[in-house]
Structure formats: structure tokens, C-alpha cells
Amino acid sequence: MGKGTLYIVSAPSGAGKSSLIAALLEQNPTYAMKVSVSHTTRGMRPGEQDGVHYHFVEKEHFIELIGKGEFLEYAEVFGNYYGTSRVWIENTLNKGIDVFLDIDWQGARQIRSQMPEAKSIFILPPSKEELERRLNTRGQDSDAVIAKRMGEAKSEISHYSEYDYVIINDDFDVALMDFKAIIRAERLKQDKQAAKYSAMLSALLAE
């Protein structure tokens, strides 16, 4: 059995990244694909579940895990720590399961420096106007927060060229097909196929 592939997925807020990942996983069995669940020191919000939305831990324990090198990447945001478990990702990949990591460009750089074999995908909105419309339609943020997110979006988008693949999420169904095509193509690469079908290849090449 071959290793799974780590997919780094980034996008400005409102581009549809989380929806695309969720739709992809809904159509595929969990033994083939999983989303990485980050550790965090922030409090649990209503409706959240430990181990589903985040692994909620105390700050002291998080700092202890940093010291042990347990995280592929971590960051402090508004006084709370967030980190990606190295052990969980490596164990999951070793089972032949693809892992999707929803992360910003800074975290993506940290991951790529340690796991250069990871594949990266950037999701773009078709326009600034459409991005702002989507943020307003969600009804989750105030005008001030939306203005802040739009400012952050320009910075995030400026790093699209650091990624292996770029998907334009204009039509959701088309973007999802593009997402699936990337995964399919990666699974058909020679090294993946050779590992998956080693016995068959040996038989084909036998005298």
C-alpha cells in the first residue's frame, strides 16, 4: 500500500474553500480521505465538538507539545494557539489516506519546508465584488469585520503563485470537478500506481 498525499488548501475567507473540502469528502469514503483537525487553546464554542472541529487543549499542554516537536506548524492568533499535529498527519498518510489541510499561506510555507512532497491548492474567487457579496450573504460578520477580511484577502491572494494548483470558484460545481480532477491526477502518478499495483506489475514483468 502506498502513502496518502497531503493537500494544503488555502484561500481568502469567503472563497468557498471549506465548502469545497466538505463536498469532496461527502462524496468519498473516510478511509480514503480525511481533513486534518487542528489543536487549539481557545475555548469551545456552542455546537463544537472536541476532536471534530478542533482538539481543545490547555495552553500549558500546547506549549509542552511545541517543545516535543509535535506540530508541523503552529501560530498564536489573538492570544490563542493553533497547531497541526505532525504525528496524526504522518500516521494517517502512512495508512494510504489522503489528508486535507485547510491553512493560510504562512502555515502552508511552514508545512512545505518540512514536507516538500505535499501538494498545494489555492482557491480564488472570480472577483473582489463576488467575494464581498459572499461575505455579506453569510451573515456572520459585521461591516467592519467584512472590510477587514477584504483587506486580508488581497494579502492572501498575492501568494497564489506559491501553490501547485489554482481553482477559480465561480461556479461551485465546476470548481468541485476541478478539485476532484487534481486528486484523481495525483493518484494516477507513476509512483502512486507502482505502489498500489506492485503485485500486478511484478506479474506482468515476470518471465
Curated annotation (Swiss-Prot):
Q: Name one GO cellular component term.
A: cytosol
Q: What is its EC number?
A: 2.7.4.8
* CDD domains (UniProt xref): GMPK
Q: Which reaction does it catalyse?
A: GMP + ATP = GDP + ADP; dZMP + ATP = dZDP + ADP
| List of residues binding ATP | A11, P12, S13, G14, A15, G16, K17, S18
Question: What keywords were assigned to this record?
Answer: ATP-binding, Cytoplasm, Kinase, Nucleotide-binding, Transferase
Mind telling me which InterPro entries this protein's record contains? Answer: GK/Ca_channel_bsu, Guanylate_kin-like_dom, Guanylate_kinase, Guanylate_kinase_CS, P-loop_NTPase
Which EC main class describes this enzyme? transferase
Please give the start and end residues of each transmembrane region: none
Look up the record and name the pathway of this protein. Answer: Purine metabolism
**Sample GO molecular function, one term:** ATP binding
User: In terms of domain of life, where is this protein from?
Assistant: Bacteria
Q: Which SUPFAM superfamilies match?
A: P-loop containing nucleoside triphosphate hydrolases
**A Pfam entry, by short name:** Guanylate_kin
List the subcellular locations: Cytoplasm
- Boundaries of every Guanylate kinase-like domain copy: 4-184
> SMART domains of this UniProt entry?
GuKc
- What family does this belong to? Belongs to the guanylate kinase family.
**What exactly does this protein do?**
Essential for recycling GMP and indirectly, cGMP.
User: What is the protein name given in its UniProt record?
Assistant: Guanylate kinase
Species the sequence originates in: Vibrio cholerae serotype O1 (strain ATCC 39315 / El Tor Inaba N16961)
| Gene name as annotated | gmk
